Amino acid sequence: MKTIIYIFLLIPFISLSQGISVNVSQDARLALVGDERGNKAFTTNVNVGAEFRGLQKGSSYFLMRPELEYADLKGGELYRMTANFGYTFNKWIKDVDFTVTLGGGMLSRYELGGLHTQANLQTTWYFTKGIGLFLDSEFVQRIDLPNKFVGYSGKIGIKIILR
């Protein structure tokens, strides 16, 4: 039932958007070396998002990007749902996009539930038509982090433009 509700909520965005892409990323540090909290290399921390693009205005366009994150961290799994809004600047350098977003949402970890906020800076390089690699710098405020003010993660991922 939840899936049907989500589909009906997304239909207006799908029909009004000027383009849709799918993003899949992994936290680079957790994938390669682990972290100081005891998570080893190859720790799963996957983000999946859908990007709905607005009309192109000059060198940029507005976007909305809902995301889901799952991380199998030491001490407990993390689930996050986020709604991001921002701008992509795609006319400065050929085949390169620069995206700035702000967002917020809900998370669940250690039997804790709560809100989080985040800011992202993303650079995408399109190596072929409709497929690109991106680096995403994320600054996030989460209740489950020891430093509850701001945490940082660097993600690497792939973006596929569907239309």
Task: Tell me what each language-model feature is.
Residues K2, V24, F98-V100, T123:
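Intrinsically disordered/low-complexity terminal segments and short unstructured peptides
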Residues L16-L63, L68, K155-R163:
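Short glycine/proline- and aromatic-enriched beta-strand/turn motifs that initiate or cap beta-hairpins
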Residues V22, L32-G38, L68-Y70, A119-R163:
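Predominantly the C-terminal beta-signal and adjacent terminal strand-loop region
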